Design a protein with these regions (language model features):
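C-terminal segment of N-terminal export signals and the immediately downstream linker at the start
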Residues: 1, 22-48
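Substrate-binding rim/cap in mid-to-C-terminal beta-strand-loop elements of soluble/periplasmic
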Residues: 502, 506-556, 631-679, 693-696
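Short, solvent-exposed turn/loop segments enriched in Gly/Ser/Thr/Pro and often Arg
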Residues: 87-107, 161-171, 422-426, 492-495, ...
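N-terminal export signals
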Residues: 6-27
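Secreted, luminal/periplasmic, and some membrane-associated catalytic domains
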Residues: 44-46, 55-57, 76, 80, ...
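Short, surface-exposed loop/helix-turn segments at secondary-structure junctions
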Residues: 617-635
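Short, structured active-site-proximal loop/turn typified by the sulfatase FGly-forming signature C/S-X-P-X-R
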Residues: 63-105, 109-113, 157-159, 514
Length: 697
């Protein structure tokens, strides 16, 4: 009996063979298919054989984020179930500590030296440094295949949900749903619309109002005007009403801002939204969310939405646009006196261009609801006002609820043997402004709040962990005794206290040249005149003849001398308290010391000590050290001896010791081969990790 997934694989491959090789090749394929389908497919039951849940940024260590003790105390009952039914311990990430590198490590069983994902934004020779020439969140960045690709070769079908590095899709069977920032599909990020009168915020954000500092906008500054041409009865306003025109992704929505209270403070408190000034889309008080509202958004397929790359003519981009019917949810974050507003739009993160097979997108939305994949974005936007914190918590709840609902869908509606599932919201919480710096005793901000305030913050963080625990409970309920459940994470999070603006240092040394726009805080690098620059997350590029044009690794006495000068200045760098932020510097040819590939790093790789983080921004004040608004991070930290970077590792299923605490922290590279051993599958030769014999029966 041919299964549905076998038939889909057959017809998709057969169609391609007919088109390319004719019916002779088709006949050969059918014979191979008959042989293949005569073999068992490895599916033991109707339940998934493996569910690997990888919440992003879920810190777990024995000192402060004592997750296993919380579980023993009853706070996390489903963590406790997995601990009792399987083995558990801590896992250590790889440098430089953040998401794309460590997901690639988990899913290939290799370090960056082998899988090649040295960073999120990577620069390689032959391309201008102004542009990211290799994106670490893209599946094509990996030099070796991930676990789902290897398993598919053995006719094991994967379901992949919100996994960084999974798109463009690498599997022909199964399901791929919205890989994060992989450059695949039509993704509309949440956005804040903020008063253009707030010049201080605009200057402070600079490029920080865009996805990864170069993508589509995450905050847009707008002006108000008097209301005009409304064809409906507008609510009475006790202050002069104002109007904003919000156009995003080709859809225009008007906002009528008014004061519904008859008092003397002239504080506006409400916004009525309409797409045509004839019908009401939503009428919201300050602090309220709308329901999901239908919108039609336009995506220019000839536009990469990257401010650093050349663009086609506007008419050509316009002709290339396609329309997406989707939904928006609106939050009035904050209002104030005349012309001040802060409004947030979050869009349904799911459409047919973000799911493969595409027809499943509609079914998911109908079954589970519009997708809220994660809260906020990178760089974070919900860090500037007290009301941003409330909005963050509400949006995080939407994300956690959606992912909890998706467990049953993935387990029962996708016909997949193995499932890989991530959620980014834990990372967003621990690297935001509001929590980690005030609850971790290693943070200089720890004493800035009272014990009572800290207890409230801990309560909010532990609630997030409880909701992750709820998702784990739903996973358990959708597995059976023959299934494996694995829980891990890519990295933890460390308190961030001070930003270190290395490019300000290089500008002061006369090694970096730029022009600053004093109005919006954006700047333009003079690459030809710039000899040294820091670029995310841990790379310094050096050329005594300038860094203009396509990047090529320099060499010779002048290069070596300049590189040594830069190293000395970095090692001597200290803040006003004499604390030096540099932990380690290695030359590109020694990148193997940090398990990094030489061809995808800068001329220097520089690691920062905890509480200090490298920032690419250039500021007009030329300050090198600045207290960070964010209070958590994970980039450019050597994780081995920084326990705050550690993560959980729990595994249960046939052949795994029960109620067993792993004696020492493991390495991320050991998770993949352990899973493959338990599944009874061959471990590829490129894998650097080894199975954890300690936990096997």
């Amino acid at each position: 009996m041919t299964s549905r997934r076998e038939f889909i694989k057959y017809i998709s491959v057969a169609g391609g063979i007919i088109a390319v090789g004719g019916f002779g090749a088709y006949y050969k394929l059918t014979e191979e298919f008959r042989k293949e389908t005569s073999l068992p497919d490895g599916r033991v039951t109707g339940r998934p054989k493996l569910y690997w849940f990888i919440p992003d940024g879920l810190r777990c260590e024995p000192v402060t984020f004592r997750v296993y003790e919380w579980a023993r105390e009853g706070l996390l009952p489903n963590f406790q179930k997995v601990m009792q039914s399987g083995s558990f311990g801590y896992s250590i990430p790889v440098f430089p500590g953040h998401t794309p590198t460590n997901f690639a490590t988990l899913l290939t069983g290799t370090t960056p030296k082998v899988h090649g994902v040295a960073d999120g934004p990577m620069r390689i020779e032959g391309y201008p440094l102004k542009m990211v020439s290799k994106g670490g969140f893209s599946s094509i960045a990996k030099k070796v295949p991930p676990i789902w690709y290897t398993l598919e070769k053995e006719n094991i079908v994967s379901g992949i949900l919100s996994i960084p590095g999974s798109t463009p899709p690498e599997i022909n069977m199964g399901v791929t749903i919205k890989g994060r920032w992989g450059g695949w599909g039509l993704d509309f990020p949440a956005i804040n619309f903020h008063s253009a009168q707030d010049i201080e915020l605009k200057q402070d954000q600079g490029f920080g109002n865009r996805v990864f500092y170069f993508g589509s906008e995450l905050t847009r500054f707008l002006n108000c005007r008097p209301p005009a041409d409304w064809a409906i009865d507008l609510p009475k306003s006790y202050s002069q009403p104002r109007e904003i025109r919000i156009t995003n992704w080709g859809e225009t929505i008007y906002g009528y801002i008014y004061n519904s209270k008859n008092n003397s403070d002239h504080h506006y408190d409400s916004v009525l939204f309409s797409k045509d000034k004839q019908t009401v889309l939503a009428n919201l008080k300050e602090g309220q969310w709308s329901n999901w509202c239908p919108v039609k958004l336009r995506w220019e397929t000839k536009n990469d939405y990257n401010i650093n790359t050349p663009k086609r003519m506007p008419w050509e981009r316009d002709l290339s646009s396609i329309t997406i019917n989707t939904e928006v949810k609106i939050k009035v974050i904050r209002l104030g006196r005349k012309d001040f507003f802060r409004i947030r739009f979050i869009y349904n993160n799911l459409n047919k261009y973000l799911v493969r097979p595409s027809h499943m997108a509609e079914d998911i939305v109908e079954s589970v609801g519009p997708m809220v994949d994660f809260v906020d974005n990178y760089p974070p936007q919900l860090i500037y006002f007290d009301e941003d914190k409330t909005t963050f918590l509400e949006e995080a709840q939407l994300s956690l609820d959606w992912h909890a609902k998706m467990v049953g869908y993935m387990a029962n509606r996708t016909d997949c043997d193995v499932i890989f599932h991530s959620i980014y919201t834990p990372n967003q919480m621990l690297t935001s402004r509001w929590w980690l710096g005030y609850i971790d005793p290693e943070s200089p901000r720890y004493r800035q709040v009272s014990d009572m305030q800290r207890n409230v913050l801990w309560g909010e963080v532990k609630k997030m962990y409880q909701q992750i625990d709820t998702i784990i409970g739903k996973i358990i309920n959708n597995l059976d005794e023959e299934s494996y459940l694995v829980i891990s994470s890519d990295h933890g999070a460390v308190p961030l206290f001070k930003e270190v603006r290395l490019n300000n240092l290089f500008a002061k040394m006369g090694l970096l040249k730029f022009k600053m726009n004093s109005y919006n805080g954006e700047y333009e690098i003079d690459w030809a005149a710039t000899r040294v620059i820091y670029l995310k997350m841990d790379n310094i590029y050096i050329n005594p003849d300038g860094l203009g044009g396509n990047y090529k690794r320099a060499s010779g006495p002048a290069y070596s001398a300049l590189r040594e000068t830069v190293k000395r200045n970095l090692l001597d760098l200290a803040d006003e308290n004499g604390i030096k932020p540099v932990d380690k510097i290695v030359n590109w040819e020694d990148a193997g010391q940090l398990n990094l590939p030489m061809d995808r790093v800068g001329d220097l790789v520089v690691a920062n000590r905890p509480n200090y983080g490298w920032i690419e921004d250039i500021s007009s004040d030329m300050m090198i050290f600045k207290e960070s608004l964010k209070s958590g991070y994970k980039q450019a930290i050597i994780p081995d001896n920084v326990k705050a970077m550690w993560t959980p590792f729990l595994i249960m299923g046939p052949g795994v010791k029960r109620n067993y605490r792993i004696s020492e922290p493991i390495r991320h590279i050991d998770q993949y081969p352990t899973i493959m051993r338990l599944l009874g599958k061959r471990i590829p030769k490129f894998v650097e990790g080894v199975p954890l014999e300690e936990i096997l029966i």
